[in-house]
């Protein structure tokens, strides 16, 4: 399975992406999430995801 990281500052959208999509159907699993660009960068280094889904404009860092 491909590892997915969700990086989105709006909690409602982040939760929607995580729980409304059937990730296993597309051979993926959500391994982490982040609410800021800086958190996302830290998670990328720690989790080494295959796919990062991110917002374009984020607090701290785009």
Model regions and ranges:
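Non-catalytic signal-transmission and effector/linker regions of two-component phosphorelay proteins
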Residues: 1-3
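Active-site residues of response regulator receiver
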Residues: 55
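Conserved acidic carboxylate
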Residues: 8
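Two-component/phosphorelay signaling modules centered on CheY-like receiver
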Residues: 11-32
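Receiver (REC) domain active-site loop signature in two-component systems and cognate sites
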Residues: 58
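Receiver (REC) domain switch-region micro-motif
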Residues: 52
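Conserved catalytic motifs of ABC-family nucleotide-binding domains
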Residues: 48
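Helix N-cap/capping motif at the beta->alpha junctions
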Residues: 33-42
């Amino acid at each position: 399975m491909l590892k997915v990281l969700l990086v989105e500052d709006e909690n409602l959208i982040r939760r929607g992406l995580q729980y409304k999509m059937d990730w296993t159907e597309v051979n993926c699993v959500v391994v982490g999430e982040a609410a800021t660009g800086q958190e996302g960068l830290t998670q990328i280094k720690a989790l080494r995801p295959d796919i990062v889904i991110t917002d374009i404009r984020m607090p701290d860092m785009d």
